[in-house]
């Protein structure tokens, strides 16, 4: 459906035009201050790369909905596509192939704990990436997605925060209840026939009922999810905490302000995660300590990874073999000190300034902003990285997000557009922020009234002169390349998949 709309709006020239185009509301560009938010949400100021899983793929396998789905991929292929490449693959087969090739993330990663895998590689004196490739090739190690009903591949703990998973966002709720939680359900659909089963996933005759060991939910309401949870943490609601929100329906940053303290045992979102990180760090002294992890990081869009398959031709793995970062996910060793999780939660890490930040392929240099945060938020000593800016309150975390995002800091936006202008040779992009370079939106401003965002390379709309936001106007009017291989709008009709 979306492709049909996008084809029509693109062919008619209405993309990037106020009143035209097709910018889906839900999830389109709701998270305005993305550059700073990504540093905070995924802890990339302290460690990279993060693990970020696709929700639909995770639950499709975890809730065993693939056992009931007989849809063939060819049914959804374009009439102009090379259907022979897709062949008789089921929907599940295409998902597994995409995960194994690194086109999509796949967590859990393998059928052995990554901490164990790195230790095995160390014991053999082999780089962990090389060891994993050898183990996969020899059949001693497998992708977890190939056997999601094997107990070694179950996700064991699920934390629900700001979501009524079972009552709202879960599609196929009865399968969540039956297979993920192992509780009463009204699922009545029959499993698919043997000849309809996916070829890429191991079929176990007895489907598991109850994969999770623990479901933890934090909420201020009693919902379908809290009723099915093992532990419920009472949460503060809107007028009991300091927080910030934005939406794709209008270009403003909003604050939540605490009128009262959270009653009884309720805690704010910030306090919940702060206290969990403190307890984890305390227990880690005796249990986990320092470990080396290995992250199977998917190939990134808006990056050179997109050039791994020239002309859209999918290589034959039997011919090329498994090559991390080329024909499979990147395999990145990451040192973890689990005793320092709390310390890192309370401070801004060094990587934002050292390695820079980036959104949608646009790099930002935020060294100056990190130094400014030392004065704005104060700083204190850490064992991990010396003196670091404080993030010990919710409002300090908000100020960090705003300081490091182009939509709220004109200097960051200008830096991003300067990087884009240098890469494209298009100096016209610099005009977009010549009147807002001095803008600095902070917590003190938005707690008084909503603040309107400014034009930033984080997104594709032009806000110059108070214009209403419309997606892709930046690309159409200022010739910023679209985020595609060609830099133009195109229709994905000439590749194998």
Where are these regions (language model features)?
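Domain-level signature for respiratory redox metalloenzymes
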Residues: 1-217, 222-497
């Amino acid at each position: 459906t979306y492709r049909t709309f996008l084809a029509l709006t693109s062919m008619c020239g209405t993309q990037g035009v106020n009143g035209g185009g097709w910018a889906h509301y839900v999830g389109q560009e709701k998270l305005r201050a993305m550059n700073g938010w990504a540093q905070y949400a995924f802890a990339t100021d302290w460690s990279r790369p993060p693990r970020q899983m696709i929700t639909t793929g995770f639950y499709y396998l975890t809730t065993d909905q693939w056992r009931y789905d007989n849809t063939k991929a060819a049914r959804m292929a374009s009439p102009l596509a090379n259907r022979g490449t897709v062949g008789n693959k089921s929907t599940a087969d295409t998902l597994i192939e995409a995960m194994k090739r690194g086109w999509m993330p796949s967590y859990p990663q393998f059928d052995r704990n990554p901490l164990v895998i790195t230790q095995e590689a160390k014991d053999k004196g082999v780089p962990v990436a090389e060891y994993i490739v050898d183990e996969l090739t020899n059949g001693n190690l497998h992708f977890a997605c190939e056997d999601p009903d094997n107990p070694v591949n179950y996700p064991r703990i699920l934390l629900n925060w700001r979501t009524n998973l079972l009552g709202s966002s879960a599609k196929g709720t009865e399968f969540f209840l039956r297979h993920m939680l192992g509780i009463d359900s009204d699922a009545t659909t029959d499993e698919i026939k043997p000849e309809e089963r996916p070829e890429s996933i191991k079929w176990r005759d007895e489907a598991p009922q109850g994969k999770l060991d623990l479901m933890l939910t934090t909420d201020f309401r009693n919902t379908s999810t809290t009723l099915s949870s093992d532990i419920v943490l009472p949460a503060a609601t809107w007028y009991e905490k300091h927080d910030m929100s934005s939406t794709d329906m209008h270009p403003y940053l909003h604050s939540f302000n605490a009128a009262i303290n959270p009653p009884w045992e309720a805690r704010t979102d910030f306090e919940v995660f702060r206290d969990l990180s403190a307890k984890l760090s305390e227990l880690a002294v005796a249990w986990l300590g320092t470990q080396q992890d290995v992250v199977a990081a998917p190939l990134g869009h808006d990056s050179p990874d997109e050039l791994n398959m020239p002309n859209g031709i999918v290589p034959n793995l039997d011919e090329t073999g498994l090559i991390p970062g080329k024909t499979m996910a990147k395999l990145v060793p990451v040192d973890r000190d689990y005793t320092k999780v709390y310390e890192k939660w309370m401070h801004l890490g060094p990587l934002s300034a050292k390695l820079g930040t980036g959104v949608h392929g646009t790099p930002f240099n935020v060294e100056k902003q990190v130094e400014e945060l030392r004065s704005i938020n104060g700083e204190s000593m850490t064992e991990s990285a010396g003196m670091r800016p404080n993030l010990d309150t919710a409002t300090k975390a908000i100020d960090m997000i705003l300081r490091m995002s182009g939509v709220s800091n004109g200097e960051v936006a200008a830096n991003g557009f300067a990087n884009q202008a240098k890469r494209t040779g298009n100096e016209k992009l610099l005009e977009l922020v010549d009147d807002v370079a001095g803008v600095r939106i902070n917590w003190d401003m938005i707690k008084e009234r909503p603040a309107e965002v400014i034009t930033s390379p984080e997104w594709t709309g032009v806000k110059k002169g108070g214009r209403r936001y419309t997606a892709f106007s930046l690309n159409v009017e200022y010739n910023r390349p679209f985020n595609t291989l060609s830099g133009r709008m195109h229709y994905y009709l000439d590749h194998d998949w």
